[in-house]
Design a protein with these regions (language model features):
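Short, surface-exposed loop/turn microsegments at beta-strand edges and helix-strand junctions
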Residues: 3, 37, 137-147, 160-175, ...
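A short glycine-rich beta-alpha junction/loop motif
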Residues: 5-8, 28-55, 203-211, 220, ...
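Short, ligand-facing micro-motifs at secondary-structure edges
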Residues: 8-12, 21-28, 153-165, 180-207, ...
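Short, solvent-exposed loop/turn positions at domain surfaces
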Residues: 29, 168-169, 245, 288-291
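Non-catalytic DNA-recognition/assembly elements of restriction-modification systems
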Residues: 51-55, 66-67, 106-135, 258, ...
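Short amphipathic coiled-coil heptad-repeat segments
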Residues: 66-117, 289-321
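Sequence-specific dsDNA recognition surfaces
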Residues: 107-108, 122-137, 151-180
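Amphipathic alpha-helical coiled-coil segments
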Residues: 275-289
Length: 324
């Protein structure tokens, strides 16, 4: 009813935190929560200032939110730039090392074109003592052994969140510090991601069947290898090898093991690892600062909408003119 409520004011009412929170409280259905229109939503009481004030509030919020959204977009662009920088630092270090102007040699492999002349190039299987698929049994919400899944591998690290459990597992499938996990089945843009397991809990942990464990041998440092496996060049080729299916791709261990990797001497691996840990930590620190700024702007946007549509903040013509 346009004679009673301005459409943009109604939009901001429906987008306000208090309205969304009430909807969440009333929602029913486990798989697809929903709210009923005639018996629930239609019964909500909305704040209804005079129509001219509604339009003034909507105009003020349109301009204010557009400015906030532009600031957030600029900061997200900064995050994209930092992500590209992080990836380029890793890609260069694992393929050329950290010395300036190394003497290079050509190599005939799938994703590598040249490496420092004193480096080796070998297949993944040559630096791995064993490869194991994870458990294929059903998990439960509570149990003895936490189970890592594909969602627990993020940005080259393992996140111990949203864990499922099982009560029994073969001892051979308990993870040890230095074990690498790669995601053999996932969406085309996520398959192949890897992480190193570092034991930081007292309980034994295992892993699900969509993950493959690589236990390295004496030729490679697991954390250096993790940088290689997550480098843009290696991942791009690995994903080309993955077999697509409906919304998923599969990269089996046989194909993965055949891929080539650069292999510097061990001391150089450790030097590259130290360099990358320092550089990526610096980038990650800036990323965290920018993300905190985005979170602050997002929270302010929600708060501003809430205060304006509930009357906690009165919007005058002078307010609208000041931001026009």
């Amino acid at each position: 009813k346009p004679e009673r409520i301005a459409s943009r004011f109604l939009f901001y009412c429906l987008a306000s935190p208090w309205f969304i929170e009430r909807c969440n409280l009333l929602a029913y259905g486990a798989k697809m929560p929903r709210v009923n229109w005639p018996t629930q939503l239609a019964q909500f009481n909305l704040p209804l200032p005079p129509l001219p004030e509604q339009k003034r509030i909507a105009t003020y919020l349109d301009t204010s939110c557009a400015a906030i959204d532009a600031a957030v977009a600029a900061k997200r662009s900064q995050l994209d730039t930092l992500d590209a920088l992080r990836k380029s630092i890793i890609q260069r270090a694992v393929t050329y090392g950290v010395e300036a102007n190394p003497k290079l040699r050509q190599v005939d492999s799938d994703w590598l074109r040249e490496v420092p002349s004193h480096w080796s190039v070998c297949r993944v299987k040559r630096v791995v003592a064993r490869m194991d698929y994870g458990i294929g049994v059903s998990t439960v919400d509570e149990g003895r052994y936490p189970v890592l899944k594909m969602g627990n591998i993020q940005e080259g690290e393992i996140r111990f969140t949203n864990l499922d459990f099982i009560d029994e597992v073969d001892d051979n499938l308990i993870l040890e510090t230095g074990d690498l996990l790669y995601n053999r089945t996932n969406s085309p843009d996520q398959v192949g991601k890897a992480a190193v397991f570092r034991k930081s809990r007292t309980d034994a942990i295992t892993f699900a069947s969509y993950l493959v464990r690589l236990r390295v041998n004496h030729r490679v440092n697991a954390w250096f290898l993790n940088y290689v496996l997550n480098s843009t060049g290696f991942l791009a080729f690995a994903r080309r090898l993955a077999v697509p299916s409906v919304q998923q791709s599969n990269l089996n261990s046989t194909r993965y093991a055949q891929m080539f990797i650069p292999l510097p001497p061990m001391q150089e691996q450790l030097a590259i690892l130290s360099f990358l840990n320092e550089k990526t930590a610096a980038v990650d620190s800036v990323v965290a600062t920018i993300q905190a700024q985005i979170d602050t702007l997002t929270a302010y946007r929600k708060s501003l909408i809430h205060e304006c549509v509930t009357g906690q903040r009165r919007v005058t013509e002078a307010d609208v003119a000041a931001i026009a």
